């Protein structure tokens, strides 16, 4: 039977959605498009061969005559532009009410409860860039042991701790405490551990030991349907965290995009059946939020250079799906995600070549198609386009 290798290139949007301005974004945001404008020499030949430049509305790449895959783009139906919302929608959940955000920081009651249960004082408690806030409070934390708490435009409760001051296990335990607190009326989509190292301002750097503590999905996803059918759901990167482990049969966390590709390949080489579901987060975390278009461009080129290896390790019936989960235009103001169309590229030995899938009304169509390919129950939301692929 077919096996699906599903890779999320985190935040690689391809242009503003019609409602982008309602989410605080300009109609000119385009993660990939604006990177191309700054770096027209970007080399992503393998994604171009898959048809990324042939997607409707993409005018910054020349289209190619004979793409080797199917290609298209999806709108987001959910009310959000974050990781949780994007991944949940692509697996069949429409988030019709935005997750709660805390634009002025967390209430006195929340912070006092957190301090009481963790035994540590809080500093920060405001929306901030993660790299900026560790510079602001990193030295203070070394002196006092106080924990840095902050949020963003997303629905997140983030805890930053120097690994040399607060051990990782304590940081992770504090996140579990925060997850218990941030429920009900105060429910945030994710509590995030943000460990870093360094001795003084200007030298603090995040480590790769991040962990996300998500809400449980509101209803069954495609992942649950695949697992319940007795197939594998193998999660690479932060996929396990995004779904709080629901619908996952095995998982591995990763240190970088290239580590994510390596672990995806490791799973591909094993005797399994079902779904390998990978998230490559560096595009978003290292380059999108930090507004680093040059770094983003290099990361895209690095991923693109690994695609031949991924394709070479596919079995006869394997199907490769590559898509994003939202945008994060590194040329745009601020540090937050951007609400964009996402690209979809699909490849396999038995898949049509050069077929334009057009524009899909929801990310959930991707998950419905994955379910259909694997002959399992379709999710509540989304329409399969499997019939267009063969």
Curated annotation (Swiss-Prot):
Matches recorded under CDD domains: PPM
GO biological process: 2-deoxyribose 1-phosphate catabolic process; 5-phosphoribose 1-diphosphate biosynthetic process; metabolic compound salvage; nucleotide metabolic process
Keyword terms, alphabetized: Cytoplasm, Isomerase, Manganese, Metal-binding
UniProt remark on cofactor binding: Binds 2 manganese ions.
One Pfam family it belongs to: Metalloenzyme
Enzymatic reactions: 2-deoxy-alpha-D-ribose 1-phosphate = 2-deoxy-D-ribose 5-phosphate; alpha-D-ribose 1-phosphate = D-ribose 5-phosphate
Function statement: Isomerase that catalyzes the conversion of deoxy-ribose 1-phosphate (dRib-1-P) and ribose 1-phosphate (Rib-1-P) to deoxy-ribose 5-phosphate (dRib-5-P) and ribose 5-phosphate (Rib-5-P), respectively.
Family affiliation: Belongs to the phosphopentomutase family.
Name of the protein in question: Phosphopentomutase
């Amino acid at each position: 039977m077919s096996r699906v290798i599903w890779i999320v290139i985190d935040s690689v949007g391809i242009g503003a959605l019609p409602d982008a301005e309602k989410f605080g974004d300009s109609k000119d945001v385009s993660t990939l498009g604006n990177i191309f404008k700054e770096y027209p020499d970007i080399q992503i030949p393998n994604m171009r061969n898959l048809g990324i430049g042939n997607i409707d509305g993409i005018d910054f790449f020349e289209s190619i005559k004979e793409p080797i895959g199917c290609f298209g783009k999806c709108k987001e139906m959910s009310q959000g532009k974050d990781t949780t919302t994007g991944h949940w929608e692509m697996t069949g959940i429409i988030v019709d009410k935005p997750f709660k955000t805390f634009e002025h920081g967390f209430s006195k009651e929340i912070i006092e409860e957190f301090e009481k249960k963790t035994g540590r004082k809080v500093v920060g408690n405001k929306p901030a860039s993660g790299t900026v806030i560790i510079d602001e409070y990193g030295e203070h934390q070394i002196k006092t042991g106080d924990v840095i708490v902050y949020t963003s435009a997303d629905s997140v409760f983030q805890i930053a701790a120097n690994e040399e001051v607060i051990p990782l296990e304590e940081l992770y335990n504090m996140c579990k405490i925060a997850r218990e607190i941030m429920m009900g009326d105060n429910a945030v989509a994710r509590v995030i551990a943000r460990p870093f190292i360094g001795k003084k301002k200007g030298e603090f750097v995040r480590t790769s030991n991040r962990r996300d503590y998500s809400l449980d999905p509101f209803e069954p996803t495609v992942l649950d349907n695949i697992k319940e059918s007795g197939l594998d759901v193998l999660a690479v990167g932060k996929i396990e965290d995004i779904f709080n482990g629901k619908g996952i049969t095995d998982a591995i966390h990763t240190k970088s995009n290239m580590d994510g590709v390596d672990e995806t390949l490791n799973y591909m080489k094993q005797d399994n059946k079902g779904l390998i579901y990978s998230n490559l987060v560096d595009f978003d975390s290292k380059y999108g939020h930090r507004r680093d278009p040059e770094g983003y461009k290099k990361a895209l080129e690095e991923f693109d250079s690994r695609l031949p290896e991924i394709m070479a390790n596919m079995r006869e019936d394997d199907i490769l799906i590559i898509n994003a989960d939202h945008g994060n235009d590194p040329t745009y103001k601020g540090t937050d995600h951007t609400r964009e169309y996402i690209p979809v590229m699909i490849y396999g030995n038995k898949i049509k070549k050069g077929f334009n899938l057009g524009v899909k009304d929801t990310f959930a169509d991707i998950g419905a198609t994955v379910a259909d390919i694997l002959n399992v129950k379709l999710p509540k939301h989304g329409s399969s386009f499997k019939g267009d692929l063969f």
